[in-house]
């Protein structure tokens, strides 16, 4: 979908929202009583999406959003941690699921919204299976900010021009990388920009080699110095040495992602970035570009695996508009707002009543379901926060050639021992 079409779709959704208000004869009353909620997030370039949602919320319940973007994730987390103590900050905020949700919930950041989930599940607006990712103990603290797969995006026209097909095995994947490299194009996107992206290839290679190995590592059942983990690092090192990855300061969001795509570089990223191609880039999904599940390294594996990211939106526990915030979260899960979000984001949504329209997301979702692809939680949400945040710095140093495999695995193992012990002491008494 071209940018003009994407904007038109969002404007159309907003127009429908406005029309329904006029139809009820309640336009002036709705405007007069609109509650504005401060909404903090770290999703750079997403304000257009959140503004579209705001229009839907305003129509449905007379509540609108005032988005504030924090492009730096570290600054964002520090700001929210301070707001948790003072109550001076947003009404609604984006966060992360998994271990990060535990820290936020137990630290008093989030309000309990179990009642929101109870009603949404009863009305068929969301699956109960998703709820556990946002639970701490027997309480639920957030709703999904979309549920995104992490496939490999690729330039479909370049593949055709170069005589390439979607790889089904690791050998075929390596052959594709070598062929793209031979064309003078760097085949794979990798980055340490902002630190966090350094985990992308680490998690992917682990699940492609052995998803159980990944799950055991992220649940502290094995160490980073385990021979099987070291083997994955050696595979990664081999790919680095072949010159298959982009420079460490590469950005792969928005316009930069489009530039990479147009060159023919493949991009492993969450489907939340799909709109960068279909919106900003004006590319047509399924025609100009597409996505595939990365093949297994280990041919003995019977099924493929894909990383899944479940972002979170919650209400600040000490927020001044808590009742309105909870009401907004419930409305967010209903069909009208979810349909707007699906169109504005170009991604899938958690409400099963909303059909998947985007051809790339539709095709990927069908492939995952048909082939029973293992869906595995992202590394960023899969361990104690200090372990992950300090760990990505070590991984980044490895990617840049500043640490050997032995140094990297040894340092990660020591860090894991320290942070898992601290986590156990803090939360597992």
Locations of the language-model features?
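Conserved N-terminal structural module of periplasmic/extracytoplasmic solute-binding proteins
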Residues: 3-7, 11, 19, 23-102, ...
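Conserved C-terminal helix/tail region of periplasmic/extracytoplasmic solute-binding proteins
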Residues: 35, 160, 372-429
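A structural signal for short loop-to-beta-strand junctions that line the ligand-binding cleft
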Residues: 82-83, 90-91, 121-156, 186-189, ...
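Hinge/lid segment of periplasmic solute-binding proteins
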Residues: 98-150, 174, 201, 291
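Short, solvent-exposed loop/beta-turn-alpha elements that line the ligand-binding surface or hinge
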Residues: 112-126, 188, 192, 209-231, ...
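Extracytoplasmic/periplasmic solute-binding protein
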Residues: 137, 141-145, 150, 174-221, ...
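Extracytoplasmic/periplasmic substrate-recognition and gating elements
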Residues: 162, 242, 280-345
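Glycine-centered hinge/linker elements that transmit conformational signals in sensory
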Residues: 219-249
